[in-house]
């Protein structure tokens, strides 16, 4: 069936090229397109932009609720996962727009016929990076030359990267082949909320003496994952149940694995229902593995308590890869 998959990719790429080549002849508009694949990542950026410019949010299925909330504020939205809408509305609009803002890697950008005066900006979906990606992804050695060329065409579509640190700028330069002059050291809009919440916590502590401490567990996504993470929750409940409660937030791609898992007085599996900032604000302790959410938590909490649960470190490092010198930067035990 591999030939069928390759044929589908070829048809997809040719159709994107065909539609965008026709649209690129049109006059460039003042439209700003925001490509959204991560919820709770824009934090007011879209609302601020729409005060002065027409903005259209193109979203993946994981962001449907957030997109619909924006639509109620009179923001134009288009689903990327609807083939008809994608080819006949999204692609032409992206091609004609002066600015395209991206929060992730979007494969179709490599096929898009880009207007010479258009600007594509990568704002990413994380403050920092723990695992490797792009050219540093361990799986790259198993990909074909055609795949590598396709990845490169996507990386080269970005004109600028919004970053909050030199470390993250270095990551993009290694992972996407970006250049230093493409880095915009503005800080990320998504992190403002954590700084504001941190100030509020300092000014007002609302915990009571009988407050049960909250552990938040945020495992990252693993390719092909079909089972829940290996955290020994029954043992935790036995040892900690009197003083703690556990909230699990799975990656959106695997949340369905927990749909039929019962909640107990100790553990709940509905962390995905809360915005990231709100969930982390409640946490007295964060347990994670390779998730970049730890950077958000560190910004939010003055005394951030973190445990890194790397039960599959060797396999993960071999399959995906971890950032160099990572262990020197960790703020908690492994």
Predicted segments, located by residue:
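N-terminal pre-catalytic "stem/leader" segment of glycosyltransferase-like enzymes
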Residues: 1-89, 99
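Donor nucleotide-activated moiety binding/catalytic core segment of transferases
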Residues: 81-94, 252-295
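Catalytic donor nucleotide-activated moiety binding site of glycosyltransferases and closely related
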Residues: 58-73, 240-270
């Amino acid at each position: 069936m591999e030939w069928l998959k390759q044929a589908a990719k070829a048809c997809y790429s040719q159709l994107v090229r065909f539609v965008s080549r026709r649209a690129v002849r049109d006059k460039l508009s003042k439209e700003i397109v925001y490509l959204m694949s991560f919820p709770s990542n824009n934090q007011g950026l879209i609302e601020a932009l729409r005060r002065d410019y027409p903005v259209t949010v193109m979203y993946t299925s994981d962001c449907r609720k957030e997109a619909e909330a924006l639509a109620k504020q009179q923001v134009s939205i288009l689903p990327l996962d609807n083939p008809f809408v994608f080819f006949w509305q999204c692609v032409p609009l992206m091609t004609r727009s002066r600015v395209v803002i991206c929060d992730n890697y979007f494969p179709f950008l490599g096929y898009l016929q880009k207007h010479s005066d258009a600007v594509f900006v990568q704002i990413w979906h994380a403050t920092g990076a723990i695992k490797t990606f792009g050219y540093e992804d361990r799986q790259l050695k198993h990909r074909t030359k055609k795949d590598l060329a396709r990845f490169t065409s996507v990386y080269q579509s970005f004109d600028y990267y919004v970053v909050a640190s030199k470390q993250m700028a270095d990551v993009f330069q290694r992972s996407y082949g970006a250049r230093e002059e493409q880095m915009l050291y503005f800080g990320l809009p998504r992190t403002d909320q954590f700084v504001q919440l941190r100030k509020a916590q300092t000014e007002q502590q609302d915990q009571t003496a009988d407050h049960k401490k909250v552990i938040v567990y945020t495992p990252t996504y693993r390719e092909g994952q079909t089972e829940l993470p290996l955290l020994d929750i029954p043992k935790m409940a036995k040892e900690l149940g009197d003083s703690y409660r556990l909230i699990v937030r799975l990656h959106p791609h695997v949340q369905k694995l927990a749909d039929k898992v019962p909640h107990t007085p100790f553990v709940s599996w509905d962390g995905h229902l809360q915005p990231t900032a709100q969930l982390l604000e409640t946490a007295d302790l964060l347990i994670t593995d390779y998730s970049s959410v730890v950077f958000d938590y560190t910004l939010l909490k003055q005394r951030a308590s973190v445990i890194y649960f790397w039960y599959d470190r060797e396999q993960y490092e071999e399959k995906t890869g971890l950032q160099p010198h990572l262990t020197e930067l960790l703020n908690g035990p492994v």
